[in-house]
Swiss-Prot record:
Keywords tagged on the record: Apoptosis, Endoplasmic reticulum, Membrane, Transmembrane, Transmembrane helix
Entry's Gene Ontology cellular component terms: oligosaccharyltransferase complex
Pfam families listed in its UniProt record: DAD
Organism (species): Oryza sativa subsp. indica (Rice)
InterPro entries: DAD/Ost2
GO biological-process terms attached to the record: protein N-linked glycosylation
Pathway(s): Protein modification; protein glycosylation
Record-given protein name: Dolichyl-diphosphooligosaccharide--protein glycosyltransferase subunit DAD1
Name of the gene: DAD1
Length: 114
């Protein structure tokens, strides 16, 4: 059992060192993803405590947060310089795709609200 604990500590330390070498723009995107998922979790907890009377509003909020997080992950994949699949794609194009997809997502969410 002590070996598993030391392996877990080594794993966490190596992940921390690897993440410290991550560029700042990717860390900002990661923070945005964490914020979006945390907001969705807060909405789910609120729904569990208070109730979900306007259920379409609850669904719209959660789907908006999760959809935005998914789009941000796609942006992170496209902007990452180590990713060889998107070498020819400029970061400006990836960001423009992100903004356009977010616009479409939120138009659909607003339409769902009624």
């Amino acid at each position: 059992m002590p070996r598993a604990t030391s392996d877990a500590k080594l794993l966490i330390q190596s992940l921390g060192k690897a993440y410290a070498a991550t560029p700042t723009n990717l860390k900002i995107i990661d923070l945005y993803v964490v914020f979006a998922v945390a907001t969705a979790l807060i909405q789910v907890v609120y729904m569990g405590i208070v109730g979900s009377f306007p259920f379409n509003s609850f669904l719209s909020g959660v789907l908006s947060c999760i959809g935005t997080a998914v789009l941000a992950v796609c942006l992170r994949i496209q902007v990452n310089k180590d990713n060889k699949e998107f070498k020819d794609l400029p970061p400006e194009r990836a960001f423009a795709d992100f903004v356009l997809c977010n616009l479409v997502l939120h138009l659909v969410i607003m339409n769902f609200l009624g």
